[in-house]
């Protein structure tokens, strides 16, 4: 579905002032309109001015792509960002979160949180009177998913009939891929080692959002997962906060590396995605990451464009 600027604005009008905790907060049409707006902004077909509005960044985890893309997105939209990490505020000295959230709502126009616990994000959303954006928690990474599906749409021209294979840990990135993918009509085929599959509750939640003809398949076999896949997606085997498990996970995930042999078993014109940072030689080989099938750096760039679109919608800039 391609919409003109007026149609996009109409579909996204109801998002002004809302939180973005998960892609399931939006309708299928709203997610599609966000991707369309992202393309318009990327191609220079749309100009938006947020008029010096301020985005507060509360990041408890290290970040390159998420932090910088939000900073650049606000700058390009005529706004600005400020760093509000917990250690830089009175939260570090015990001020209740609900007090901090209400005060920040008087100074900022939106907050983007990157935190270990999803509960903290929900608490900010509860007490803030401005939009709260999920910039990554242990449960979901919805901004990443938006960028992923924009990249897939660019590669194939449409998301209709697309099958995405995810190889690796059933983590927060996969959770958002399932939820966003089902809203967009994408089939998801997953291969994870036993004990590292995605949360059944998230799988069921995604299935409730899906059209009856869509499928979400979970297995322990990477070859089964890539069969018929147009997209092969992987991520690190040990996420932030799991560094102590890295050696153990490296043994468990042996056989789940995205290498040329595995890629050759997917559709002929399949593409490769990874949200980065990558551990080359572990979840993905260097030759695959650098191959002509890789859209990994397009994917990283698209974080900027989808977050511009998201900020414009939530801050009422349309």
Swiss-Prot record:
Domain of life: Bacteria
Major subcellular site: cytoplasm
UniProt keyword terms in alphabetical order: Amino-acid biosynthesis, Arginine biosynthesis, Cytoplasm, Transferase
UniProt source species: Prochlorococcus marinus (strain SARG / CCMP1375 / SS120)
Protein's name in the database: Ornithine carbamoyltransferase
Function: Reversibly catalyzes the transfer of the carbamoyl group from carbamoyl phosphate (CP) to the N(epsilon) atom of ornithine (ORN) to produce L-citrulline.
Pathway entry: Amino-acid biosynthesis; L-arginine biosynthesis; L-arginine from L-ornithine and carbamoyl phosphate: step 1/3
Binding-site residues for L-ornithine, renumbered to this chain: 172, 235, 239-240
GO-annotated molecular function: amino acid binding; ornithine carbamoyltransferase activity
Residues binding carbamoyl phosphate: 63-66, 90, 114, 141-144, 275-276, 303
Swiss-Prot/TrEMBL catalytic activity: carbamoyl phosphate + L-ornithine = L-citrulline + phosphate + H(+)
Single GO cellular component term: cytoplasm
Biological process, per Gene Ontology: arginine biosynthetic process via ornithine; citrulline biosynthetic process; L-arginine biosynthetic process
Pfam families reported in the protein's UniProt record: OTCace (PF00185), OTCace_N (PF02729)
Enzyme Commission number(s): 2.1.3.3
PANTHER family per UniProt: ORNITHINE CARBAMOYLTRANSFERASE, MITOCHONDRIAL, ORNITHINE TRANSCARBAMYLASE, MITOCHONDRIAL
Protein family: Belongs to the aspartate/ornithine carbamoyltransferase superfamily. OTCase family.
PROSITE patterns: CARBAMOYLTRANSFERASE
Gene3D superfamilies noted in UniProt: Aspartate/ornithine carbamoyltransferase
């Amino acid at each position: 579905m391609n919409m003109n600027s007026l149609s996009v604005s109409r579909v996204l009008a109801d998002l002004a002032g809302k939180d973005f905790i998960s892609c399931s907060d939006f309708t299928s049409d709203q997610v599609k309109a966000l991707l369309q707006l992202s393309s318009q902004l990327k191609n220079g077909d749309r100009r938006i001015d947020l008029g010096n509005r301020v985005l507060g960044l509360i990041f408890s985890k290290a970040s390159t792509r998420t932090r910088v893309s939000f900073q650049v997105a606000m700058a390009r939209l005529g706004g600005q960002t400020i760093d509000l990490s917990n250690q830089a505020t009175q939260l570090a000295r015990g001020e209740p979160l609900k007090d901090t959230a209400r005060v920040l709502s008087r100074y900022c126009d939106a907050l983007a949180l990157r935190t270990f616990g999803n509960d903290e994000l929900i608490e900010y959303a509860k007490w803030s009177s401005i939009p709260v954006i999920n910039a990554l928690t242990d449960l979901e990474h919805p901004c990443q998913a938006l960028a992923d599906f924009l990249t897939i749409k660019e590669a194939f021209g449409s998301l209709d009939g697309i099958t995405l294979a995810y190889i690796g840990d059933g983590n927060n990135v996969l959770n958002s891929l399932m939820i966003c993918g089902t809203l967009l009509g994408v089939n998801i085929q997953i291969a994870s080692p036993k004990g590292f599959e995605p949360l059944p509750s998230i799988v069921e939640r995604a299935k409730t959002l899906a059209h009856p003809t869509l499928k979400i398949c979970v297995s322990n076999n990477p070859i089964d997962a890539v069969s018929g896949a147009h997209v092969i997606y992987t991520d690190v085997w040990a996420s932030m906060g799991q560094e102590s498990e890295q050696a153990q996970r490296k043994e468990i995930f042996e056989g789940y590396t995205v290498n040329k042999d595995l890629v050759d078993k997917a559709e002929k014109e399949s593409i490769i995605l990874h949200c980065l940072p990558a551990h080359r030689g572990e979840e993905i080989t260097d030759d695959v990451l650098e191959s002509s099938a890789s859209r990994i750096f397009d994917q990283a760039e698209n974080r900027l464009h989808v977050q511009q679109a998201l900020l414009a919608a939530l801050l009422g800039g349309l």
